[in-house]
Amino acid sequence: MRNHILTASSLADALGKGHFKTQLDLMIAKTSTEEAPFISNNIIEWGVKYEPIATSFYEKMNHLKIVEFGLVPHPKLTIFGASPDGICDLDSPTDYVGRMLEIKCPPIRKFTKEVPYHYWIQMQGQLETCDLEECDFLQVKLFEYDSDDRYNEDISYN
């Protein structure tokens, strides 16, 4: 389904403000009659690997539970959908109920105080699709130790 609809994550590309595809490449991909295979890369795999850890961190930090929904079709625009990373459930503190969460775990991108514009566009598409008003943008920098010795060095109190 995702191959033939515009999703919030590709909205910035559609507007010519993205970093991943040109408008022409996106149009060709979305209008092709063939199913395009999903092409992963190291950055995507890193995010998939660490997003659950970031979600758990957010849940514990804010004393709430995040619910995942997968691809949510827009209620009116049949050619649009969004896959938010999660939405705070009804048992969350009152000021968090219905708040959306967008997570990025970039292995190499530098963090800034502002949400990168192409991600802000993505979040606006997600909020519109889900008819919500707020979205927290969580960036998490994680790294892996290459050895037990390196880890032990890092945690020693000497």
What do the predicted segments below correspond to?
Residues 60-84, 88-158:
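Nucleic-acid nuclease catalytic cores
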